[in-house]
Amino acid sequence: MNNSLSPKAIRELREETCNPLGAPQVTTDLSENIIMTSLDDLHNWARLSSLWPLLYGTACCFIEFAALIGSRFDFDRFGLVPRSSPRQADLLIVAGTVTMKMAPALVRLYEQMPEPKYVIAMGACTITGGMFSADSTTAVRGVDKLIPVDLYLPGCPPRPEAIFDAVIKLRKKVGNESILERNKAEQTHRYLTVKHDMKLVFSENTGEYLNKKSEKAIKSSDLEMIEENIKVKIEENLIDEETK
Protein backbone atom coordinates (compact mmCIF):
# COMPACT_ATOMS: atom_id res chain seq x y z
CA MET A 1 0.00 0.00 0.00
CA ASN A 2 2.89 2.32 0.74
CA ASN A 3 4.17 1.90 -2.82
CA SER A 4 0.96 3.41 -4.23
CA LEU A 5 1.14 6.54 -2.03
CA SER A 6 2.88 9.69 -3.06
CA PRO A 7 5.84 11.00 -1.03
CA LYS A 8 3.66 13.82 0.35
CA ALA A 9 1.02 11.36 1.53
CA ILE A 10 3.71 9.23 3.16
CA ARG A 11 5.05 12.26 5.11
CA GLU A 12 1.55 13.19 6.28
CA LEU A 13 0.88 9.62 7.37
CA ARG A 14 4.18 9.54 9.25
CA GLU A 15 3.38 12.81 11.07
CA GLU A 16 -0.05 11.51 12.11
CA THR A 17 1.37 8.27 13.51
CA CYS A 18 4.35 9.91 15.29
CA ASN A 19 2.49 12.98 16.60
CA PRO A 20 -1.26 12.44 16.71
CA LEU A 21 -1.88 15.87 18.25
CA GLY A 22 -0.20 17.70 15.39
CA ALA A 23 2.33 20.51 15.42
CA PRO A 24 1.55 23.25 17.99
CA GLN A 25 0.59 26.61 16.54
CA VAL A 26 1.66 29.84 18.31
CA THR A 27 -1.42 31.99 18.66
CA THR A 28 -1.46 35.77 18.62
CA ASP A 29 -2.30 36.03 22.31
CA LEU A 30 0.59 33.77 23.25
CA SER A 31 3.11 35.72 21.15
CA GLU A 32 2.22 38.95 22.95
CA ASN A 33 3.18 37.41 26.31
CA ILE A 34 6.63 36.18 25.31
CA ILE A 35 9.73 38.40 25.51
CA MET A 36 12.83 37.37 23.60
CA THR A 37 15.97 39.01 24.96
CA SER A 38 19.50 38.29 26.10
CA LEU A 39 20.84 38.07 29.61
CA ASP A 40 22.88 41.25 29.18
CA ASP A 41 19.87 43.26 27.99
CA LEU A 42 17.70 42.02 30.85
CA HIS A 43 20.43 42.74 33.38
CA ASN A 44 21.10 46.22 32.01
CA TRP A 45 17.39 47.07 31.82
CA ALA A 46 16.99 46.21 35.50
CA ARG A 47 19.99 48.32 36.53
CA LEU A 48 19.62 51.48 34.47
CA SER A 49 16.36 52.48 36.19
CA SER A 50 17.54 51.71 39.72
CA LEU A 51 20.86 53.48 40.19
CA TRP A 52 21.61 53.96 43.88
CA PRO A 53 24.19 56.75 44.28
CA LEU A 54 26.66 57.29 47.09
CA LEU A 55 27.10 61.05 47.44
CA TYR A 56 30.70 62.09 48.12
CA GLY A 57 30.61 65.88 48.44
CA THR A 58 33.56 67.88 49.74
CA ALA A 59 32.92 71.42 48.47
CA CYS A 60 30.42 73.81 46.90
CA CYS A 61 29.51 71.57 43.92
CA PHE A 62 27.63 69.31 46.28
CA ILE A 63 25.22 72.16 47.14
CA GLU A 64 23.93 72.07 43.56
CA PHE A 65 23.38 68.34 43.83
CA ALA A 66 21.48 68.85 47.08
CA ALA A 67 18.99 70.96 45.10
CA LEU A 68 17.89 67.81 43.26
CA ILE A 69 16.37 66.40 46.43
CA GLY A 70 13.71 69.11 46.47
CA SER A 71 10.37 68.98 44.69
CA ARG A 72 11.44 71.34 41.89
CA PHE A 73 13.79 68.81 40.27
CA ASP A 74 12.85 65.58 42.11
CA PHE A 75 15.58 63.16 41.10
CA ASP A 76 13.55 60.24 42.50
CA ARG A 77 11.79 59.97 39.13
CA PHE A 78 15.04 58.61 37.67
CA GLY A 79 15.10 55.82 40.22
CA LEU A 80 17.96 57.43 42.16
CA VAL A 81 17.90 56.43 45.81
CA PRO A 82 20.77 57.97 47.84
CA ARG A 83 22.53 55.46 50.05
CA SER A 84 24.75 56.09 53.06
CA SER A 85 26.64 52.81 52.75
CA PRO A 86 28.99 52.00 49.84
CA ARG A 87 28.00 48.33 50.02
CA GLN A 88 24.46 49.25 48.93
CA ALA A 89 25.41 51.71 46.17
CA ASP A 90 26.38 51.21 42.54
CA LEU A 91 27.03 54.86 41.59
CA LEU A 92 29.63 57.13 43.21
CA ILE A 93 29.16 60.87 42.61
CA VAL A 94 32.31 62.81 43.55
CA ALA A 95 31.63 66.55 43.90
CA GLY A 96 34.26 68.98 45.14
CA THR A 97 37.98 69.15 45.75
CA VAL A 98 39.74 65.91 46.65
CA THR A 99 42.76 66.42 48.88
CA MET A 100 45.66 64.10 49.56
CA LYS A 101 44.34 63.20 53.01
CA MET A 102 40.87 62.38 51.66
CA ALA A 103 42.20 60.32 48.74
CA PRO A 104 42.64 57.06 50.74
CA ALA A 105 39.10 57.38 52.11
CA LEU A 106 37.69 57.87 48.61
CA VAL A 107 39.56 54.84 47.27
CA ARG A 108 38.35 52.76 50.22
CA LEU A 109 34.73 53.73 49.55
CA TYR A 110 35.08 52.82 45.88
CA GLU A 111 36.59 49.43 46.66
CA GLN A 112 33.75 48.64 49.09
CA MET A 113 31.11 49.15 46.38
CA PRO A 114 29.92 45.94 44.68
CA GLU A 115 30.35 45.36 40.95
CA PRO A 116 29.15 46.69 38.58
CA LYS A 117 29.80 50.23 39.80
CA TYR A 118 30.08 53.62 38.13
CA VAL A 119 31.65 56.99 38.94
CA ILE A 120 30.57 60.51 37.97
CA ALA A 121 33.20 63.25 38.41
CA MET A 122 31.19 66.41 39.07
CA GLY A 123 32.75 69.86 38.83
CA ALA A 124 36.05 71.36 37.71
CA CYS A 125 37.79 70.74 41.04
CA THR A 126 37.01 67.03 40.85
CA ILE A 127 38.05 66.66 37.21
CA THR A 128 41.27 68.72 37.10
CA GLY A 129 41.76 70.24 40.54
CA GLY A 130 40.12 73.50 39.45
CA MET A 131 41.51 76.72 40.87
CA PHE A 132 43.51 74.72 43.40
CA SER A 133 45.58 73.01 40.68
CA ALA A 134 47.79 76.07 40.14
CA ASP A 135 49.72 76.31 43.40
CA SER A 136 48.16 73.93 45.93
CA THR A 137 50.35 71.11 47.21
CA THR A 138 47.45 69.14 48.72
CA ALA A 139 44.82 69.03 45.95
CA VAL A 140 44.59 65.99 43.67
CA ARG A 141 44.81 66.94 39.99
CA GLY A 142 41.88 64.86 38.83
CA VAL A 143 39.99 62.12 40.63
CA ASP A 144 40.66 59.76 37.71
CA LYS A 145 44.18 59.34 39.09
CA LEU A 146 42.61 57.56 42.07
CA ILE A 147 39.57 55.70 40.70
CA PRO A 148 38.23 55.04 37.17
CA VAL A 149 35.69 57.64 36.03
CA ASP A 150 32.79 56.75 33.73
CA LEU A 151 31.40 60.23 33.12
CA TYR A 152 32.86 63.73 33.47
CA LEU A 153 30.51 66.61 34.34
CA PRO A 154 32.34 69.97 33.98
CA GLY A 155 31.19 73.20 35.56
CA CYS A 156 31.85 75.43 38.54
CA PRO A 157 29.40 74.35 39.74
CA PRO A 158 27.26 72.37 37.24
CA ARG A 159 23.56 73.19 37.08
CA PRO A 160 21.00 70.62 38.31
CA GLU A 161 19.82 70.22 34.71
CA ALA A 162 23.37 69.23 33.73
CA ILE A 163 23.37 66.58 36.45
CA PHE A 164 20.17 65.12 34.99
CA ASP A 165 21.80 65.07 31.55
CA ALA A 166 24.79 63.22 33.01
CA VAL A 167 22.52 60.62 34.62
CA ILE A 168 20.67 60.09 31.32
CA LYS A 169 23.96 59.59 29.45
CA LEU A 170 25.13 57.16 32.12
CA ARG A 171 21.90 55.18 31.75
CA LYS A 172 22.53 54.91 28.00
CA LYS A 173 25.99 53.57 28.73
CA VAL A 174 24.61 51.05 31.23
CA GLY A 175 22.01 49.86 28.73
CA ASN A 176 24.56 49.15 25.97
CA GLU A 177 27.34 47.37 27.81
CA SER A 178 28.10 43.70 28.34
CA ILE A 179 28.96 42.04 31.62
CA LEU A 180 32.01 40.27 30.21
CA GLU A 181 33.32 43.40 28.49
CA ARG A 182 32.83 45.36 31.70
CA ASN A 183 35.00 42.91 33.64
CA LYS A 184 37.75 43.10 31.02
CA ALA A 185 37.84 46.91 31.22
CA GLU A 186 38.36 47.05 34.98
CA GLN A 187 41.28 49.09 36.23
CA THR A 188 44.20 46.96 37.41
CA HIS A 189 46.72 49.67 38.36
CA ARG A 190 46.23 52.89 40.27
CA TYR A 191 48.60 55.84 40.24
CA LEU A 192 48.33 58.45 42.97
CA THR A 193 49.12 62.10 42.34
CA VAL A 194 51.96 62.55 44.78
CA LYS A 195 54.37 64.50 42.57
CA HIS A 196 53.33 67.92 41.30
CA ASP A 197 55.16 69.98 38.72
CA MET A 198 55.74 73.09 40.80
CA LYS A 199 57.78 76.04 39.55
CA LEU A 200 59.62 78.61 41.61
CA VAL A 201 58.13 82.10 41.42
CA PHE A 202 60.42 84.89 42.55
CA SER A 203 59.06 87.71 44.65
CA GLU A 204 58.28 90.96 42.87
CA ASN A 205 59.18 92.95 45.98
CA THR A 206 62.86 93.58 45.26
CA GLY A 207 63.14 96.80 47.26
CA GLU A 208 64.05 98.94 44.26
CA TYR A 209 61.09 101.22 44.83
CA LEU A 210 62.72 102.45 48.04
CA ASN A 211 65.56 103.99 46.02
CA LYS A 212 63.23 106.42 44.25
CA LYS A 213 63.30 109.97 45.58
CA SER A 214 59.53 110.27 45.62
CA GLU A 215 59.08 107.09 47.65
CA LYS A 216 61.93 107.33 50.12
CA ALA A 217 61.19 107.04 53.79
CA ILE A 218 60.64 110.47 55.38
CA LYS A 219 63.19 111.38 58.06
CA SER A 220 62.24 112.85 61.42
CA SER A 221 64.02 116.14 60.61
CA ASP A 222 61.96 116.46 57.44
CA LEU A 223 58.77 115.94 59.46
CA GLU A 224 59.74 118.79 61.80
CA MET A 225 60.31 121.11 58.85
CA ILE A 226 56.93 120.18 57.38
CA GLU A 227 55.18 120.87 60.69
CA GLU A 228 56.87 124.30 60.96
CA ASN A 229 55.83 125.21 57.41
CA ILE A 230 52.24 124.22 58.17
CA LYS A 231 52.21 126.38 61.32
CA VAL A 232 53.59 129.35 59.41
CA LYS A 233 50.91 129.05 56.72
CA ILE A 234 48.18 128.77 59.34
CA GLU A 235 49.43 131.94 61.08
CA GLU A 236 49.59 133.81 57.77
CA ASN A 237 46.02 132.82 56.99
CA LEU A 238 44.85 134.01 60.40
CA ILE A 239 46.59 137.38 59.94
CA ASP A 240 44.98 137.83 56.51
CA GLU A 241 41.53 137.13 57.95
CA GLU A 242 42.03 139.69 60.76
CA THR A 243 43.13 142.39 58.36
CA LYS A 244 40.06 141.84 56.24
Curated annotation (Swiss-Prot):
EC number: 7.1.1.-
Catalyzed chemical reaction(s): a plastoquinone + NADH + (n+1) H(+)(in) = a plastoquinol + NAD(+) + n H(+)(out); a plastoquinone + NADPH + (n+1) H(+)(in) = a plastoquinol + NADP(+) + n H(+)(out)
Example of a GO MF term: iron ion binding
Pfam families, per database record: Oxidored_q6
Gene3D superfamilies for the chain: 3.40.50.12280
Cofactor binding: number and manner: Binds 1 [4Fe-4S] cluster.
Protein name: NAD(P)H-quinone oxidoreductase subunit K
Main subcellular location: membrane
Annotated localization: Cellular thylakoid membrane
GO biological process: aerobic respiration; electron transport coupled proton transport; photosynthesis, light reaction
Domain of life: Bacteria
Cofactor: [4Fe-4S] cluster
GO cellular component, one term: plasma membrane-derived thylakoid membrane
UniProt enzyme class: translocase
Residues involved in [4Fe-4S] cluster binding: 60-61, 125, 156
Matching InterPro entries: NADH_UbQ_OxRdtase-like_20kDa, NADH_UQ_OxRdtase_20Kd_su
Keyword terms: 4Fe-4S, Iron, Iron-sulfur, Membrane, Metal-binding, NAD, NADP, Plastoquinone, Quinone, Thylakoid, Translocase, Transport
Species this chain originates from: Prochlorococcus marinus (strain MIT 9515)
Gene name, Swiss-Prot/TrEMBL: ndhK
Subunit structure: NDH-1 can be composed of about 15 different subunits; different subcomplexes with different compositions have been identified which probably have different functions.
Family: Belongs to the complex I 20 kDa subunit family.
Bilayer disposition of the protein: Peripheral membrane protein
Function: NDH-1 shuttles electrons from an unknown electron donor, via FMN and iron-sulfur (Fe-S) centers, to quinones in the respiratory and/or the photosynthetic chain. The immediate electron acceptor for the enzyme in this species is believed to be plastoquinone. Couples the redox reaction to proton translocation, and thus conserves the redox energy in a proton gradient. Cyanobacterial NDH-1 also plays a role in inorganic carbon-concentration.
